[in-house]
A protein has these predicted regions:
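Intracellular innate-immunity NLR/STAND receptor architecture
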Residues: 1-210
């Protein structure tokens, strides 16, 4: 099944969806750098910035991160996610092989529950059901981390994010893929403009695409 966002975003069913705390950023981007930094996520980040939407992210594949302690990164990560109005989670083939990506996801879903943060999952050339049930690349990645004490929280987070209404960009022709990317960028812009200027509550509806 391929999901699309129905716009404009006009209502949200959960009472937790209204964000009452002050936000430093409009959008936090969670992604695996080597998969999408120089295509989908990079394009989305540029498109949002051009519209004046303030984004933030921590690229887990950035070489500069090797010099930082885990505690320092964790503190930076928590502040970035908690200070964001919306999180876009780009789930790609190698996402689950990064413990830092998985930790981001756990924190994002925590903020969804406690702060009403809007979470938009993007399934970038992966099947949502494989994310939900940890199959294929997601299952293989977690198998290599099996002795980690955070395993259950990671599995729960992957299952929960895959159950959210989201956007599935499957493997396909270049023109079709670019069109889906543009449509997603437009819908995120609509969402952010609604939250920032109209102060309306937002709802995302999954639509099945034949």
């Amino acid at each position: 099944m391929t999901f699309q966002f129905q716009g404009p975003f006009s209502s949200f069913s959960s009472s937790n969806s209204i964000i009452t705390h002050r936000c430093t950023y409009d959008v936090f981007l969670s992604f695996r750098g080597k998969d999408t930094r120089y295509n989908f996520t990079g394009d989305l980040d540029n498109a949002l910035h051009k519209k004046g939407i303030n984004t933030t992210f921590i690229d887990v594949d950035d070489d500069d991160l090797e010099t930082k302690r885990d505690e320092e990164l964790s503190e930076t990560l928590v502040k970035a996610i908690e200070g964001s109005r919306t999180s876009v989670v780009v789930l790609s083939r190698n996402y689950a092989s990064s413990t830092r990506c998985l930790d981001q996801l756990v924190k994002i879903l925590e903020c969804k529950q406690t702060k009403g943060q809007v979470v938009l999952p993007v399934f970038w050339k992966v099947d949502p059901s494989d994310v939900r049930h940890q199959r294929k690349s997601f299952g293989k990645a977690l198998a290599q981390l099996e002795d980690n004490t955070k395993m259950q929280s990671w599995k729960t987070a992957l299952k929960n994010v895959a159950n959210l209404s989201g956007w599935h960009i499957a493997r396909g022709k270049g023109q079709e893929s670019r069109k889906l990317k543009r449509n997603f960028e437009t819908n995120v812009l609509d969402l952010e403009m609604s939250c920032i200027f109209d102060k309306t509550v937002v709802k995302i509806h999954p639509l099945k695409q034949d």
